[in-house]
Each structure stands twice: as structure tokens, then as C-alpha cells.
């Protein structure tokens, strides 16, 4: 995590995340993204991408809070609202720990890749992927959808991530 970077979280309409990112990324000094995750699609039997946190856009910038607020207020699409989440009036909704977890689990393209593991004593043991060494955080696993539920406190959201068991 770069100390001169500031992280912001925007709430918007589900399915409009990419539209918001596109507008924000046209501004100098702003990097906006909507994290994606790989998951196993049962019907197509392929790994596909979907939004990790529907309705959320993350913004990383070296600009000051005042400059970023000005860009947020100029958002041109009236049919799409954006609202910056803050703990208090001037404190971003992301803690340093949340930023660390997010950057640790995602790759450079802001995608949480599929993890792979084995079942040992009725517990998932991840052998490769971003969840490596995080077995204790897995509290539930759905074999049919190949999704693990993580016990991570992050914007009051439940993390459901892709984990495929290998023989």
C-alpha cells in the first residue's frame, strides 16, 4: 500500500459499476475499479467473472479529498447515483486493514482469481491461489457452486469466493 494514495468507496446502482469506473477513469489522477472474482459456472462448466461486491466502486488517488469530491460531484449521469461511503464526515470507509486484504487477494487486474484446494478432515485446505494460507477464514463451502464463504470483516459484506477442490 502506497502511503500517499487515498482510497475511497462509492456506492452506486448494481450493474452500473463499470459505467461509473469509465467516467472516473477519464479524470487525471484517478484509478477506479469494481473488483471481480472468478467463479465456476455450473451450466457452462467454465470459470467466469462476476462482480465481487455488487454496487461498490473503489477509487485510488493521490489527489486530495477536496479534489476527489469535486470530481465525484461532477458525475454527469443523472440516472446513476453515486454516494461516497465514509465512517465519519471526512474519513474514508476503508480501513488500512481492509485495503491490505483487498490488495493481497486481488491480482493487478483487480480480479480475485479462483483458488484450488483439497478436503482434509471436512475442512478446505487451499493448495494454490489467492486464499493460500487462509484456510482458517473459510467458514462454509458449497461444492455445487464451488464457492467458499470467508469470515472477513469488509464493508459489512460477506465474501463468497471461488474455490475448486482437486483430487
Show the residue positions of the predicted features.
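Structured alpha-helical
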Residues: 134
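Generic structural signal for buried aliphatic residues
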Residues: 122-124
